[in-house]
């Protein structure tokens, strides 16, 4: 069909730290060179920051480069880290504090800040607009615009006003637009749905290890002022997880008597009975955590997958007409449990390459090889190289053995131990059969520290237009009940942190798979963990999904 179109020099998909940093850098470079570069950022959330969720302890290295005067410009870095506590939780009641000497160097946070990444992105968007970037929130990029020569020429936004069966709704239908560009950057975050399509189309991961993921579940709490320690960073390993189902937690004291509390569970977990949501709820009852939350009030909830494969899992970064940046590429440094500064730097490097190409008079459609070269020469590459073994060591040797390996690698060899560990088993292939794994009896939520899924999703402010096509696509509708249920007790009903998937009984006693798509918080776990790789997440109508205030 013929669509309306707009033309830009650069289109960027996603207003997160990578996309916004790229946009700002492009405009800075244009101003320095006295040239015009038109830049458009599209964002599927209702506003910039609405879909941003991160810990976040923020390392300001890339921000220092992008805006050296960020303090004067009012960047929301309000709480410097004042202390690091790391515990190994041995059981539901006991814990051992790890002496500072034994903590891997990458886990020290002097000079970093506890922030809301959503608020930092809102600030970055203000800077970008001040530099002349056009930002369009509420518009979901549905697919890449690829010409007959296999060159990416921009993106197509999703149609609006389509009913559940895919038919235009009278008086409401608006076809999506083509946003055409000389170069297109994809900054959709972890497991971006167009990024996934591009990796497959251009075979970008042919020389990479399998990507590995975690699911991060997070809450914001208002706590008793007498328990509040602004700047305190607490991390834990161990209980409620184990060597076959690994992960770790965080509890960060920010300003205004608030804490961020969360649990990250590696999606390589093997027990299909495990529920990341319920593991997080019971984790909050541990004395190390409970001491801060008791008497407080939960005010926000959300979840998001993270890419943690690191350097060994990076796909090829470029293709004709564009590039992947940030978590769409997989630049998170798992040894630091930080991805914001690395995402920003990747966006800045890509922007430099595009500015150089446009200044040389190139018309787009080519591969940005100078982005790849600059990446390999940057501190970002050095950081990812030094942390390349971190996740694989935990997968291979468990939390304790992997922790010992990482201590030696990071603290003695500075991340340059003369061996590279590889982990090429994808996360979805790690599940045991339900009959081979122990069942897990989760305690009922008490409504004070622990809660159910529905009341949690309510706090994410998630909303979707109900009469639209379901954005969670099953390649084969029979697989959930006929294969996943007998083999794995259909893990989707547990791995989803928002209650999207249910196995329900029909009147005749048979089972059916129900998808409550309106609950979806866009975490992407189903797209990653489904053992049959039968679920594909695609973008719903723009503005749909969570509306995180300051996650």
Curated annotation (Swiss-Prot):
SUPFAM superfamilies: 4Fe-4S ferredoxins, FAD-linked reductases, C-terminal domain, FAD/NAD(P)-binding domain
Record's protein name: Electron transfer flavoprotein-ubiquinone oxidoreductase
Keyword Ligase: no
Binding site for FAD: 10-24
InterPro entries to which the protein is assigned, alphabetical: 4Fe4S_Fe-S-bd (IPR017896), ETF-QO (IPR040156), ETF-QO/FixC_UQ-bd (IPR049398), ETF-QO/FixX_C (IPR007859), FAD/NAD-bd_sf (IPR036188)
EC number of this enzyme: 1.5.5.1
Alphabetic keyword roster: 4Fe-4S, Electron transport, FAD, Flavoprotein, Iron, Iron-sulfur, Metal-binding, Oxidoreductase, Transport, Ubiquinone
Family: Belongs to the ETF-QO/FixC family.
Protein's job: Accepts electrons from ETF and reduces ubiquinone.
The 4Fe-4S ferredoxin-type domain, residue ranges: 511-540
Cofactor annotation comment: Binds 1 [4Fe-4S] cluster.
Cofactor: [4Fe-4S] cluster; FAD
Residues involved in [4Fe-4S] cluster binding: 496, 520, 523, 526
One Pfam family it belongs to: Fer4_ETF_QO
One example of a Gene Ontology biological process annotation: electron transport chain
Catalytic activity line of the entry: a ubiquinone + reduced [electron-transfer flavoprotein] = a ubiquinol + oxidized [electron-transfer flavoprotein] + H(+)
Enzyme class: oxidoreductase
């Amino acid at each position: 069909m013929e669509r309306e179109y707009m033309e830009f020099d650069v289109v960027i998909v996603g207003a997160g730290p990578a996309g916004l940093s790229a946009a700002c850098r492009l405009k800075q470079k244009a101003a320095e060179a006295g040239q015009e570069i038109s830049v458009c950022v599209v964002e599927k959330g209702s506003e910039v920051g609405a879909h941003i969720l991160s810990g976040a302890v923020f390392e300001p290295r890339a921000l220092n480069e992008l805006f050296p005067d960020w303090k004067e410009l009012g960047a929301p870095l309000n709480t410097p880290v004042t202390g690091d506590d790391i515990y190994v939780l041995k059981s539901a009641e006991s814990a051992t504090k790890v002496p500072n000497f034994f903590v891997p160097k990458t886990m020290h946070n002097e000079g970093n800040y506890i922030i809301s990444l959503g608020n930092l992105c809102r600030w970055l968007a203000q800077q970008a607009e001040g530099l002349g970037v056009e930002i369009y929130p509420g518009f979901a990029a549905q697919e890449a615009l690829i010409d007959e020569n296999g060159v990416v020429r921009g993106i197509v936004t999703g149609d609006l006003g389509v009913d559940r069966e895919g038919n235009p709704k009278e008086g409401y239908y608006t076809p999506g637009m083509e946003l055409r560009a000389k170069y297109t950057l994809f900054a959709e975050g972890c497991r971006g749905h167009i990024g996934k399509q591009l990796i497959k189309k251009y075979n970008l991961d042919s020389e990479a290890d399998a990507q590995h993921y975690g699911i991060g579940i997070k809450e914001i709490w208002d706590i008793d002022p007498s328990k509040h320690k602004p700047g305190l960073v607490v991390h834990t390993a161990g209980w409620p997880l184990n060597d076959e189902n690994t992960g770790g937690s965080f509890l960060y004291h920010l300003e205004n008597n608030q804490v961020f509390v969360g649990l990250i569970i590696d999606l390589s977990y093997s027990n299909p009975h495990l529920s990341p949501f319920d593991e997080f709820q019971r984790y909050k009852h541990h004395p190390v955590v409970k001491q801060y939350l008791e008497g407080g009030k939960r005010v926000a909830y959300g979840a998001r997958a993270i890419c943690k494969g690191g350097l060994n899992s990076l796909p090829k970064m470029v293709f004709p007409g564009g590039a992947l940046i940030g978590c769409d590429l997989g630049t998170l440094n798992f040894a630091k449990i930080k991805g914001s500064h690395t995402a920003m730097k990747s966006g800045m490097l890509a922007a430099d390459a595009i500015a150089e190409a446009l200044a040389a008079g190139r018309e787009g459609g080519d591969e940005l090889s100078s982005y790849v070269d600059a990446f390999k020469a940057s501190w970002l590459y050095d950081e990812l190289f030094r942390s390349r073994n971190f996740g694989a060591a935990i997968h291979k040797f468990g939390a304790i053995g992997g922790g010992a390996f990482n201590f030696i690698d990071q603290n003695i060899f500075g991340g340059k131990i003369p061996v590279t560990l590889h982990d090429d088993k994808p996360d979805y292939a790690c599940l045991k059969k339900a009959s081979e794994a122990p069942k897990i009896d989760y305690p009922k939520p008490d409504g004070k520290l622990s809660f159910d899924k529905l009341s949690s999703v309510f706090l994410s402010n998630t909303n979707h237009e109900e009469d639209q096509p379901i954005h969670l696509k099953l390649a084969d509708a029979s697989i959930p009940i006929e294969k996943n249920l007998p083999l794995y007790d259909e893990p989707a009903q547990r791995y989803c942190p928002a209650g999207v998937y249910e196995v329900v009984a029909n009147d005749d006693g048979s089972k059916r798979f129900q998808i409550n798509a309106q609950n979806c918080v866009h975490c992407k776990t189903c797209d990653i963990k489904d053992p049959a790789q039968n679920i594909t997440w695609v973008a719903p109508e723009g503005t749909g999904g969570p509306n995180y205030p300051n996650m």
